């Protein structure tokens, strides 16, 4: 239904055109095989999108719902570091922490705009983070400070857990849903990495860069005839 609905919306805007769906992202390979749709590795998709829209990028930080990535671009080489085993420091972690202070991710973002202090919170695991947050709640820490501390924990986990000492410098792009929709999370990264405006890259539709890149990769895939027709 998702593909059919997307094609229907595209048809309403563009008229009768031949289209080819592409799939990327975590878990996408199995779905692509089932639907007989071309699959593009996510790091390739993101790299392609950055090449087109932000070619000056030296490092890309991408946060998703279940994983986090740092991608280094060095002299034509691409190195990806990914946290795909545990959801600590990702969008789902943020949702879990938000529920502890009876709000959602958007609420965290609004609270964090007025923080006064940052508390140390572990983002490596939701269980450990809860043991850090609950005493702070009991001691009367404000939601504003807790929200900013949760975002800072995500920043620390990403930098220490993925970069592992490798410098994040040059022009840094921020991608993925959490960094697109949560301005204070992005600000925490920028503040921690000491980035100025010149070296901070926030592309338009940054939450869709993997999808954009997968579409741009269509030209690299040979498709002779449509494998399936969808009635819309």
Indicate where each model-derived feature is located.
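Active-site nucleophile and cofactor-binding loops and adjacent substrate-binding regions
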Residues: 22-23, 37-47, 61-65, 81-89, ...
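Adenine-nucleotide phosphate-binding core of ATP-dependent small-molecule kinases
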Residues: 129-160
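Glycine-rich phosphate-binding loop plus the immediately following alpha-helix
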Residues: 75-117, 216
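Conserved phosphate-binding catalytic cores of ATP/NTP-utilizing and phosphoryl-transfer enzymes
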Residues: 27-79, 159, 163-164, 211-217
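N-terminal glycine/serine-rich phosphate-binding loop of ATP-dependent small-molecule kinases
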Residues: 4-42, 187-204
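Glycine-rich phosphate-binding loops at beta-strand->alpha-helix junctions
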Residues: 26-27, 163-192, 203-207
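Glycine-rich phosphate-binding/hydrolytic loop that grips phosphoryl groups
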Residues: 94-96, 202-220, 224
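Single conserved hydrophobic/aromatic residue that forms the stacking wall/gate
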Residues: 1-3, 221-232
């Amino acid at each position: 239904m998702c593909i059919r609905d997307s094609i229907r919306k595209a048809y309403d805007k563009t008229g009768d055109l031949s289209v080819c769906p592409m799939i990327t992202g975590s878990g996408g390979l199995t779905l692509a095989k089932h639907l007989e749709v071309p699959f593009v590795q996510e790091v390739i998709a993101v790299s392609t999108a950055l090449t087109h829209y932000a070619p000056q990028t030296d490092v890309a930080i991408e946060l998703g719902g279940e994983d986090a990535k740092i991608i280094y671009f060095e002299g034509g080489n691409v190195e990806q570091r990914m946290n795909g085993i545990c959801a600590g420091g990702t969008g789902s972690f943020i949702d879990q922490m938000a529920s502890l202070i009876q709000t959602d991710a958007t609420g965290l973002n609004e609270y964090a705009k007025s923080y006064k202090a940052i508390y140390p919170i572990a983002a490596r695991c939701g269980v450990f983070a809860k043991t850090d947050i609950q005493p702070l709640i009991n001691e009367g820490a404000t939601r504003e400070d807790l929200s900013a501390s949760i975002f800072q924990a995500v920043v620390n986990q990403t930098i220490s857990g993925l970069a592992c000492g490798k410098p994040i410098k040059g022009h840094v792009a921020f991608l993925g849903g959490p960094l697109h929709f949560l301005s204070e999370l992005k600000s925490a990264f920028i503040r921690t990495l000491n980035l100025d405006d010149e070296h901070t890259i926030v592309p338009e539709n940054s939450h869709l860069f993997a999808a954009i890149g997968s579409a741009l990769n269509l030209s690299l895939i040979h498709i002779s005839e449509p494998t399936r027709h969808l009635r819309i």
